[in-house]
Amino acid sequence: MAQLFFRYGAMSSGKTIEILKVAHNYEAQGRKIALMTSGLDNRSGVGTVASRIGIHRKAIPITEEMDLFEYIKEMNNHDLADGDGKLACVLIDEAQFLKRHHVLECAKIVDEFNIPVMTFGLKNDFQNHLFEGSENLLIFADKIEEMKTICHYCGHKATMNLRINNGKPVYEGEQVQIGGDESYYPVCRYHYFHPNVVR
C-alpha cells in the first residue's frame, strides 16, 4: 500500500542528497519516477534539484496554481499509452513551499493511484513558524521522519534554522527569501537565541 511520506530536517541535513539517491535507486531498477521541486526555488535555476555538494538534476517545477493530482494523472496516462508503465514514485523537494491544496493532491495521488509520494523539506522557518507545506504534511502524511544534522556552533543536534545577514542574526522579515545575501545555518535551540556565545 502506497503512503505519503514527509522527511524533514534543518538546513544542511542532507534532504536533497537523499531525494537524489532515492530517484537514482528507482531508476537503476528501471522504474519511472516524477521528480518535482518548488518553482519558487531559483538558486540553481527553476526546475533544478541541487545539493550543496554539487549534485544536481532537472525536475518538474511546481507552481502555486498547479494541480499535482491532474498533472500526475496525465503523466501516468501518457506513460501507460507509450508502454513505459505507470509511475513508481513521486518525489518532491523543497516541500515546505507546497500549498495546502498541493498536499491534499499528494494524498489523493497516494490514495487513488496507489503511487507513493515522498516529500522532503524544512519543517520550520527562521522565525520557528511552520511553513504552510510542512504544517499540512505533518497533518496528512502517513509517515513522518526527521533527518538529523548538527548545530553550526556546538555540534549538538540542530532543530532550527538561523538566518544571518552581515554577520548578525535575523529574527524578523519575509518567510520566503531566496537568492538574497542572507545565510542560513542549522542550529540548536540554545544557539538560535545565543549565536555568539561559545559553549
UniProtKB/Swiss-Prot annotation:
It is an enzyme of class 2 (transferase). It is found in: Cytoplasm. ATP binds at residues 9-16, 93-96. One of its GO terms (biological process) is DNA biosynthetic process. Keywords: ATP-binding, Cytoplasm, DNA synthesis, Kinase, Metal-binding, Nucleotide-binding, Transferase, Zinc. GO terms for cellular component: cytosol. It holds the Pfam family TK. NCBIfam families: PRK04296.1-4 (NF003299), PRK04296.1-5 (NF003300). PANTHER family: THYMIDINE KINASE (PTHR11441), THYMIDINE KINASE, CYTOSOLIC (PTHR11441:SF0). Belongs to the thymidine kinase family. This is Thymidine kinase. It comes from Lactobacillus acidophilus (strain ATCC 700396 / NCK56 / N2 / NCFM). The lineage of its organism: Bacteria, Bacillati, Bacillota, Bacilli, Lactobacillales.
